[in-house]
A protein has these predicted regions:
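Bacterial N-terminal signal peptides
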Residues: 11-23
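Non-catalytic accessory segments of hydrolases
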Residues: 27-193, 446-459, 467-477, 496, ...
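Substrate-access "cap/lid" subdomains that shape
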Residues: 113, 209, 243, 252-361, ...
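Active-site loop->helix "elbow" adjoining a glycine-rich segment at hydrolase catalytic centers
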Residues: 147, 196-199, 227-230
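Alpha/beta-hydrolase active-site loop
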Residues: 192-212, 269
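Alpha/beta-hydrolase fold nucleophile elbow
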Residues: 215-226
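Short glycine-enriched nucleophile-adjacent loop
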Residues: 230-242
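Mobile gating loops/cap/lid regions near enzyme active sites that modulate substrate access
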Residues: 396-399, 403-513
């Protein structure tokens, strides 16, 4: 057994010891809710509807100073009460997540100053829980992993709060993980790679050991994520670090690592270059740990400008990459709900780009004429670029994932989200558009209608039944067939319809299906 494996097992054993020593304390209606975990009493908040929230619960010690670029270490309380009524700082980032929200607000004529961003810190490994402590029995658990290209976002963005899911008998947990080079650096002197994946694994283990005190069932954990959060959820599910704790997976608008896993040697070369620039030609990791985080982020923006920070092959955390699994046709048959939005790429297309450029850069020469002919029915060139970009980065690898699950005797359900909000024609069913429906958290500034309210109810039916029963069902929406050779897909728009995936032929052309 390696020293690194021994250290990891020791961390899990600490969690087990904590679980045996845990004690839950339910408050009366007039008191703040309290839950005791090991030697710490977490004091939460109860809202007017009876939903309790526990915010900013630490699951690991601050990965700062000498702990920067090391595996996470379990948090240990000091035996006193812990105020869990406020969210903790978000992980270090440049603010791209907040900029996304501000851009959306400008589109609908709302002053972005109305939304303030979080505080950022390297001390950021916290989780948040929404629950009903007075509900009977143990309820299934949803762990949600936020997106943001692995460089931005935070666990308590407005769309991720869990009150509505709690009302449907789900305990909701949202988790943080180190972002950018703080979570994804590869350097020859590091003891481990994919540190953000270790963060997520530690948060999963914390939930497994302690969620029972918050009313959750540790044996019914579904992990969900959107965009890079979806790919991280999938990586966590297939990683040995998860120890089989993931019972189901919801994969929203991810998929690209099935086609393109970052090269480990290239990732390491970038890490060395980051150190060289930060240390005036030196490359030592210990010295790099002393460089201020703001300086690290500024340099990382240059060094990694054209490099996607995603999990890389690693003997302990990811011995087999998703790309290798796709190539071999073998993957763990975890039940999965998988989908994409119709216009994932539209709002990100750069002015001046052309379809020819995209075809030449991303599509094999032998396929270009057939793909061009297919796209001719999509509308103008902007629509064609969106359709192709969405298919390449999100749709086709997601369908490939569903087919892998089906091939390995698992169950997968596939959706496409097509709903365009009033006044949003310019960006369509954009990347992230489904999230307010999934959590029933429509921002006040988002234009909505009764159609959106009705669609939210149907989507909540399907998502919560998948979490609670392992299969998406809705009396309002009708039966949702599993993915098979007929490629039946739930299409969410004004309502829900079921048909063979509208763009299956495009994926066949691109992926030689």
């Amino acid at each position: 057994m390696t020293n690194t494996t021994t250290a990891l097992i020791s961390s899990w054993c600490y969690f087990c010891f904590c679980a045996l020593a845990s004690l839950a304390v339910h408050a009366t209606a007039s008191e703040a809710p309290q839950v005791r975990v090991f030697n710490t009493s977490f004091i939460g908040h109860r809202d007017s509807t009876g939903v309790e929230s526990f915010r900013g619960i630490p699951f690991a010690q601050a990965p700062m100073g000498e702990r920067r670029w090391r595996r996470p270490v379990p948090w240990q309380g000091d035996g006193g009460p812990y105020d869990a009524t406020a969210f903790a700082p978000a992980c270090m980032q440049t603010g791209s997540g907040l900029a996304w929200y501000h851009g959306m607000m400008r589109r609908v004529g709302v002053d972005p100053a109305l939304m303030e961003g979080p505080v950022y810190s390297e001390d950021c490994l916290y989780l948040n829980i929404w629950t009903d402590l007075d509900a009977e029995g143990k309820r299934p658990v949803l762990i949600f992993i936020h997106g943001g290209s692995n460089t931005g976002g935070w666990s308590y963005e407005p769309n991720y709060h869990g009150e509505s899911l709690v009302k449907r008998d789900v305990v909701v947990v949202t988790v943080a993980y180190r972002l950018g080079v703080f979570g994804w650096l590869s350097h020859p002197e590091m003891e481990a790679r994919n540190l953000a994946l270790y963060d997520l694994a530690m948060s999963l283990e914390w939930v497994y050991q302690h969620i029972g005190k918050f009313g959750g069932d540790p044996n019914r954990i579904t992990v969900s994520g959107e965009s890079s959060g979806a790919t991280n959820a999938l990586h966590l599910a297939v990683s040995p670090l998860s120890q089989g704790r993931v019972g189901g997976l919801i994969h929203q608008s991810g998929g690209w690592p099935l086609d393109d896993t970052p090269d480990r040697s290239e990732a390491t070369a970038r890490g060395i270059e980051l150190a060289r620039r930060a240390l005036d030609g030196q490359t030592g990791l210990e010295a790099l740990r002393q460089v201020p985080s703001e300086r690290i982020m500024a340099l990382a923006g240059e060094v990694y400008a054209d490099f996607q920070l995603d999990p890389i092959e690693d003997p302990e955390s990811l011995p087999v990459t998703l790309e290798s699994m796709a190539a071999s046709g073998s993957i763990a048959a975890i039940p999965m709900l998988i989908g994409t939005n119709a216009d994932e790429r539209l709002m990100y297309l750069k002015a001046g780009g052309t379809l020819d450029q995209l075809l030449q850069r991303r599509v094999a020469i032998a396929q270009q004429d057939d793909v061009r002919a297919y796209l001719s029915g999509a509308g103008d060139e902007l629509a064609q670029r969106n359709q192709l970009g969405t298919a390449l980065d999100f749709l086709c690898p997601s369908l490939e994932l569903a087919s892998l699950i089906e091939k390995n005797d698992g169950a997968a359900w596939v959706y496409r989200f097509d709903r365009v909000r009033p006044g949003f024609d310019a960006i369509g069913a954009y990347h992230g558009a489904e999230l307010p429906y999934v959590f029933d958290r429509h921002d006040d500034w988002l234009p909505s209608s009764k159609v959106d309210d009705d669609l939210t109810a149907v989507i909540l039916d399907y998502w919560t039944s998948f979490i609670t029963k392992g299969r998406p069902r809705s009396d309002q929406g009708g039966p949702w067939p599993t993915w098979s050779s007929t490629q039946q897909t739930a299409v969410f728009n004004d309502g829900v319809s079921f048909k063979a995936h509208p763009d299956r032929e495009l994926c066949r052309l691109l992926m030689d299906r």
